[in-house]
UniProtKB/Swiss-Prot annotation:
Cofactor comment: Binds 2 copper ions per heterodimer.
Glycosylation sites: N27, N250
Residue sites binding Cu cation B per the record: H171, H175, H202
Protein's UniProt keywords contain Transport: yes
Pfam families reported for this sequence: Haemocyan_bet_s, Tyrosinase
Residue positions binding Cu cation A: H41, H70
Alphabetic keyword roster: Copper, Disulfide bond, Glycoprotein, Metal-binding, Oxygen transport, Secreted, Thioether bond, Transport
Name this protein carries in UniProt: Hemocyanin type 2 unit a
Assembly notes: Decamers of large identical subunits, each containing 8 globular oxygen-binding functional units.
């Protein structure tokens, strides 16, 4: 079984080997090479088939099979690295811990020597990064990492479908805040997978799903099934299920149904060096989540998201009856003109308890509203009408089931 390690735990020998192997893979112009595999995600579009008159990107977003599609995609690239001599699995970048710069394994200022920095895609452009300030400085000014807090809300969910929505939208912000306004980078659905950082990011995304699965086992709850997108779970993922001319990997082609990809250890042949989160074991993490649920009443803003044909950064303010507005939160949408149509069937939720307290508002008041600002990847403003107005839900602490007052 292949071991996936934290990028910060790689030895110098492992780093040099991975860089050498990645360089070879990027120079491989066959169907086994980096660019051929990267095209599975976005451009050039391969779905429903390479021969179709009208094609879309094959990547799955806004659907219950998002985790499975990206699990098998990351495995596809990992297997290609192994084919060129890699001895460790796809390393992961644990972005749930606070950071002020990208890991030394994936810098963005060493463009000539490190093949994990950038490559040339099929349109003869280099991938580029435009890290946004929010990536390194918590936009909400919280005590912990922005990403850590959002991940806790995802891990708190006890139903796969609720978890998936939270989990997916969190991952979008890493894409957007690294790629920024660059066309050929992490913030565009079409070109994101041409940046090698994509796979380092998604190795961690997959690890977080594995942590949730272990939490579910600890809770005695289902960890390998979905009660939403039931038909999707039976449909082979594309383009992995296409012919060997598109996908020469016999393993991913044979195991391309989402329902077969819940058990990554058995089917994908890799493990993680640790399934802890910020040093917490599964049992400690569950205890922490239960404490979070019991400590105080919470207020959540909910958004029913759908594809808008573009990647976008969304910020929203909470405004009172006098139009006094305070920043309430931010999230991102990952998309583009080649995306499959999608819409979530449930709300993405963000904890807005803090801003309700600051503004001395109650969630059962009627005289408040959210104002959204939606900025497209290119930096242009989009109409807030593209997204449905946010709703509010109140979740009482488990110890005291009192009236919804968060003052």
């Amino acid at each position: 079984s292949l071991l996936r390690k934290n990028v910060d735990s790689l030895t110098e020998e492992e780093i040099l080997t991975l860089q050498s192997v990645m360089r070879e893979l990027q120079n491989d112009s066959s169907e086994h090479g980096f660019q051929s595999i990267a095209s599975f995600h976005g451009s050039p579009p391969l779905c429903p088939s390479p021969e179709a008159n009208k094609k879309v990107a094959c990547c799955v977003h806004g659907m219950a099979s998002f985790p499975q599609w990206h699990r098998i995609f990351t495995k596809q690239m990992e297997a290609a690295l192994m084919g060129h001599g890699a001895k460790v699995g796809m390393p992961y970048w644990d972005w749930t811990t606070s950071f002020t710069k990208l890991p030394r394994f994936i810098p963005y200022d060493d463009e000539q020597l490190n093949p994990f920095v950038r490559i040339t895609d099929l349109e003869d452009h280099f991938t580029t990064r435009d890290p946004q300030p929010e990536l390194f400085k918590d936009p909400e000014g919280g005590d912990e990492s922005f990403f850590f807090r959002q991940v806790l809300i995802a891990l708190e969910q006890r139903d796969y479908c609720d978890f998936e929505v939270q989990f997916e939208v969190i991952h979008n912000s890493i894409h957007y805040w690294i790629g920024g306004h660059q066309k050929y980078g992490m913030s565009t659905l079409e070109y994101t997978a041409y940046d090698p950082l994509f796979f380092i990011h998604h190795s961690n995304v997959d690890r977080l799903w594995a942590i949730w699965q272990e939490l579910q086992k600890y809770r005695g709850l289902p960890y390998d099934e979905s009660d939403c997108g039931v038909e999707l779970m039976r449909e082979p993922l594309q383009p992995f299920a296409q012919t060997s001319a598109t996908n020469p990997n016999n393993v991913t082609r044979a195991h391309s149904t989402p329902k077969s990809l819940f058990n990554y250890r058995q089917l994908a042949g890799y493990t993680y060096d640790t399934l802890t989160l910020n040093g917490m074991t599964i049992s400690q993490l569950e205890s922490s989540l239960l404490r979070l649920q019991k400590e105080e009443d919470r207020v959540f803003a909910g958004f029913l998201l759908r594809g808008i044909g573009s990647s976008a950064d969304v910020t929203f303010d909470l405004c009172d009856k006098d139009e006094h507005c305070d920043f309430a939160g931010t999230f991102a949408v990952l998309g583009g003109p080649l995306e499959m149509p999608w819409s979530f069937d449930r709300l993405f939720k963000m904890d807005v308890t803090k801003v309700f307290k600051q503004m001395r508002l109650r969630p059962d008041d009627s005289e408040y509203h959210f104002e959204l600002e939606v900025t497209a990847r290119a930096g242009t403003d989009l109409s807030p009408e593209l997204l449905k107005p946010g709703s509010v839900s109140f979740l009482p602490g488990r110890k005291i089931q009192n009236t919804p007052d968060v003052r």
